[in-house]
């Protein structure tokens, strides 16, 4: 990785023009995995803007449109006169063909979706070291009917004659498949060929370089002013705390609001870690009773979220006034927050998609609009996996770097129905057992999330020849790459048995354990 400053001051080596593809962000991530800096920008970005950025390559993303339909998204045609290598992916390839004099029509046979063997006709340039017959991921209903003058075929599939094409003398390339998705077995080979062999990029997107430049940028931006950070204990805010502490030290104040819905031992661990071990200035705000009292009698999940969000804002306002004044508010905004999926928020100056709101603090609601802070967002050009690498390099322990995603409202939305002290204690104990056994089995880092849910019903059971009526606990473990989709994790029966036995024997008030085997979609990862 390079740095957030690279994003702000250094030009990207590769620009991805986004035509509405669900994979545009993934293309950027894959390029960064090759240690080359990339940015996603709107397809409306002008050729003049791109010329000023001086990228070494341009990628035209896929998209849901058809180039021959009215209203289809088109890029500035002058892009093809910049003398910069271009790679069109799926819709991007069709657009390039259409713009340069070829033709695109609905697929004559049938649309091609899913895995397809790629037959390589010309194993040079873009397809160097791509094995003929390797699997590539297809997702298109249109196909190229006629190539523009000078273009040649590089590969085909059984349903797509022009699966990869090239205009070698201008370094224009197109692929009908998606090299960025994990199902394309040689997709990264294609991406590396374009980035290094065709665009002649240098590997300069490294973690250490990011840290050095980000520290310098924060120091320049902040000067001798004071910065406030709302610390949740998640990987984003924790990494940001370490980075800012390295940059400005005592000018940073972290506010940790304990709303009473964290997992067992977490508040104590976070305070001992940040405040005592690393001497980062953390103000601990114990608001447990305040939050739970507001939830008395509340069973609707949306109401719970709104109440927790409202109270967080009130506590944040009160405490920032007490601890301040502060000049800057630090936020753990990440690049996916900047890349708005709707594509409607376009910066007219840069052509980039932009976030238009202050990021909600760990999903519990936006911060007050009238807080007069300037923003410090040094992570805003990083993806989640890049943040983990930065955190690791800064010295964050695996307990935080590899911490599973945790909802802002915490255990309050893993207790269905009303939240009480008794239910919280019960769920904390059960949740700890789930995580302990997953960790003992060496599975923690292989699973996206693993947690327990408490149901607001009584289940009949028998313990010691006595009939019992107690709560059931749901075990929820899912595998995912980004949380957008997820599948339930196939845990070994022995691990499930240990989890079940320990919960019913060690957790008071529970007599049954069930396993949630619902994928997302149709379900969500959380129950509320």
From Swiss-Prot:
Q: What is its EC number?
A: 6.3.5.2
| Binding sites annotated in the UniProt record for ATP | 232-238
The pathway this protein participates in, as annotated, is: Purine metabolism; GMP biosynthesis; GMP from XMP (L-Gln route): step 1/1
Annotated catalysed reactions: XMP + L-glutamine + ATP + H2O = GMP + L-glutamate + AMP + diphosphate + 2 H(+)
What are the transmembrane regions?
none
Domain Glutamine amidotransferase type-1 residue range list: 13-204
Q: Name one Pfam family in it.
A: GATase
Q: Which GO terms describe its cellular component?
A: cytosol
Q: Where is the active site?
A: 90, 178, 180
> Disulphide bridges in this chain?
none
Report the InterPro entries cross-referenced here.
Answer: Class_I_gatase-like, GATASE, GMP_synth_C, GMP_synth_GATase, GMP_synthase, GMPS_ATP_PPase_dom, NAD/GMP_synthase, Rossmann-like_a/b/a_fold
According to the lineage, what is the superkingdom? Bacteria
Q: In this protein, which residues make up the domain named GMPS ATP-PPase?
A: 205-403
Gene3D superfamilies given in the database record = 3.30.300.10, 3.40.50.880, HUPs
Keywords for this protein? ATP-binding, Glutamine amidotransferase, GMP biosynthesis, Ligase, Nucleotide-binding, Purine biosynthesis
- What PANTHER family is this protein classified in? GMP SYNTHASE [GLUTAMINE-HYDROLYZING], GMP SYNTHASE-RELATED
The function of this protein is:
Catalyzes the synthesis of GMP from XMP.
NCBIfam families in the record? guaA_Cterm, guaA_Nterm, PRK00074.1
Q: How does it assemble?
A: Homodimer.
Report what the protein is called.
GMP synthase [glutamine-hydrolyzing]
UniProt organism field: Prochlorococcus marinus (strain NATL1A)
Q: Which gene encodes it?
A: guaA
């Amino acid at each position: 990785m390079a740095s957030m400053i690279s994003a702000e001051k250094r030009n990207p080596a590769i620009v991805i023009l986004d035509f509405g593809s669900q994979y545009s962000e993934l293309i950027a991530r894959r390029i960064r995995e090759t240690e080359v800096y990339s940015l996603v920008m709107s397809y409306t970005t002008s050729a003049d803007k791109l010329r000023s950025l001086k990228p070494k390559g341009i990628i035209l993303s896929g998209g849901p449109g058809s180039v021959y339909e009215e209203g289809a998204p088109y890029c500035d045609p002058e892009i093809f006169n910049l003398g910069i290598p271009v790679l069109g992916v799926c819709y991007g390839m069709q657009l390039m063909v259409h713009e340069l004099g070829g033709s695109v029509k609905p697929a004559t046979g049938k649309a091609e979706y899913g895995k397809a063997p790629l037959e390589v006709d010309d194993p040079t340039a873009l397809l160097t070291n791509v094995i003929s017959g390797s699997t590539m991921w297809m997702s298109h209903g249109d196909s190229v009917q006629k190539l523009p003058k000078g273009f040649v075929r590089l590969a085909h599939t059984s349903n797509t004659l022009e699966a990869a094409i090239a205009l070698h003398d201008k370094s224009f390339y197109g692929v009908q498949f998606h090299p960025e998705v994990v199902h394309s077995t040689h997709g990264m080979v294609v991406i590396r060929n374009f980035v290094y062999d065709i665009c002649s990029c240098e590997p300069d997107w490294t973690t250490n370089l990011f840290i050095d430049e980000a520290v310098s940028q924060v120091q320049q931006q902040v000067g001798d002013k004071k910065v406030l950070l709302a610390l949740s204990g998640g990987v984003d805010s924790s990494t940001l705390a370490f980075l800012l502490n390295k940059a400005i030290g005592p000018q940073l104040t972290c506010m940790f609001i304990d709303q009473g819905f964290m997992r067992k031992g977490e508040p104590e661990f976070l305070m001992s870690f940040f405040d005592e071990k690393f001497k980062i200035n953390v103000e601990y705000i114990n608001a447990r009773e305040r939050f739970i009292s507001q939830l008395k009698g509340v069973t609707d999940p949306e109401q719970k979220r709104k109440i927790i969000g409202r109270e967080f804002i009130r506590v944040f306002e009160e405490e920032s006034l007490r601890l301040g004044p502060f000049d800057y508010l630090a936020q753990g905004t990440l690049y996916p927050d900047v890349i708005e999926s709707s594509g409607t928020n376009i910066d007219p100056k840069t052509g980039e998609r932009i976030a238009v709101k202050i990021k909600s603090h760990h999903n519990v609601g936006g911060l007050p609009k009238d807080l007069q802070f300037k923003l410090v967002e040094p992570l805003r050009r990083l993806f989640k996996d890049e943040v983990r690498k930065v955190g690791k390099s800064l010295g964050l322990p695996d307990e935080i770097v590899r911490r599973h995603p945790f909802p802002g409202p915490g255990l309050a939305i893993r207790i269905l129905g009303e939240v009480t002290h008794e239910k919280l204690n019960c769920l904390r104990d059960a949740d700890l057992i789930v995580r302990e056994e997953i960790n003992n089995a060496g599975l923690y880092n292989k699973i996206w999330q693993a947690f327990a849910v408490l149901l607001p019903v009584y289940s009949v059971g028998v313990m010691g020849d006595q009939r019992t009526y107690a709560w059931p606990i749901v075990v929820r473990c899912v595998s995912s790459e980004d949380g957008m989709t997820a599948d339930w994790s196939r845990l070994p029966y022995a691990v499930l048995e240990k989890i079940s036995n320990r919960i019913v024997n060690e957790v008071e008030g529970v007599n049954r354990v069930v396993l949630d085997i619902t994928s997302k979609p149709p379900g969500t990862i959380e129950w509320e």
